[in-house]
Amino acid sequence: ECATADAINFMAKYGRGLICLALTRQRIEALGLAMMERRNESRHETAFTVSIEAREGVTTGISAHDRAHTIKTAIDPKFNERDITTPGHIFPLVGRDGGTLVRAGHTEAVIDIARAAGYDNPAGVICEIMNDDGRMARLPDLMTFAKDHNLKIASIADLIAWRRRNESLVQRMVETTLTTRIGGSWRMMIYANTVSN
């Protein structure tokens, strides 16, 4: 919803990295997207799908407007696999169920943030930031970048700590009464860990 042409242009101009769209596994399945590689051997196990484009409403697909339109189409639940084509100029990533509590990655972090912000269809656009010399920006560089562009900055560790403080990590699955021969009735509840695989 917030992926405007201006925001995408900012990422392309100042971020300089690959612009990716982090989506939940459920949304990836609804769009019928195949994984880029079945046997993911990348160092961080980033789960890329095939690249995408909106089927309608784009020209070349690469402009900030076209990429923002593709992102909005991919996120909006009223659209499905018939509204997306491949290949394209947006690179979807599959977030793991359980988010940063299962995998402490950028993909999961942006989905966790969107979910915490109350979005019904949590997703987010990410772009790694390159310095002027072509090297990837590290924390001191990112702190300066955030200050220069009036952006907020937080770590994945901060997000994980926030989730542990503010979310219930268990869910009641079953509640029943258990009557025994030796001691009357007991109220029995079974809980499940919501972040285990």
State each model region's role.
Residues 1-197:
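Catalytic domains of riboflavin
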